[in-house]
Regions:
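Catalytic beta-strand/loop cores that center a nucleophilic Ser/Cys/Thr
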Residues: 117-157
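RNA-binding accessory domains that recognize and position tRNA/RNA substrates
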Residues: 1-38, 42-43, 167-169, 181-187
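Active-site-proximal beta-strand elements of phosphoester/diester hydrolases
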Residues: 5-10, 122-123, 160-164
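A glycine-centered loop/beta-turn motif at secondary-structure junctions
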Residues: 151-187
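Cysteine-nucleophile active-site neighborhood
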Residues: 47, 51-127, 172-181, 185
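Hydrophobic anchor at the start of a short beta-strand
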Residues: 28, 79, 159
Length: 187
């Protein structure tokens, strides 16, 4: 599919992510986090992005979100989670999330991509981590400092997620290749 024809849904708004996707020819529609999976899928998006929002506590107040996110991940649409979206996807697929004693905060957090062994300096601002990896996922990125999970891939589904902020990466200019890999999942 041509880049200018890509059409994505985002569950929650994050301007930098939106800008990076627009730079790649994506048309963006933002839907409220209160939408059901069917409401999102009825719009026939090419892909779905789950990103920042009110925080994990807000999701925990509405038990339906877990089912909604699981349905989206299990759909035939590619799904990418960034930051809070990473945590929400892991929880929806049976993983666990834990509050950190000291969060990952700053623009100099080293992360290794497990497939290539390459290490990147990332920007992070989170106080929770995915502790238990869902059985349907594999770790794609690890924090060098504490070996915590910074990214997951869901091999049986068209889904992936990262805890860090890919568009704010420092140094290597192509670490936002995460977007390219995600957009490559669109059929």
């Amino acid at each position: 599919m041509e880049q200018d024809r890509r059409y994505l849904r985002t569950q929650m708004q994050k301007e930098n992510i939106i800008q990076k996707l627009k730079e790649r020819g994506c048309r963006i529609t933002i839907v409220p986090a209160s939408c059901t999976a069917q409401q999102v899928l009825d719009t026939n998006p090419d892909a779905i992005v789950l990103c920042g929002g009110a925080g994990l506590e807000a999701f925990e107040q509405n038990p339906a979100w877990k089912e909604t996110v699981a349905e989206l991940i299990k759909s035939d649409k590619p799904v990418m989670g960034i930051d809070l979206g990473h945590q929400v996807m892991a929880l929806a697929m049976g993983g666990s999330v834990e509050k950190m004693h000291c969060g990952h905060r700053g623009a100099n957090c080293p992360v290794t991509e497990t497939a290539s062994g390459r290490t990147f300096i990332t920007s992070q601002n989170h106080g929770y981590i995915v502790k238990e990896i869902p059985s349907c996922a594999t770790v794609s990125h690890l924090n060098i400092n504490d070996k915590s999970c910074e990214g997951l891939e869901y091999p049986q589904m068209k889904a992936m997620s990262v805890q860090f902020i890919p568009e704010a990466e420092i140094g290597q200019k192509n670490f936002d290749g995460i977007y390219e890999r995600f957009l490559g999942l669109i059929g």
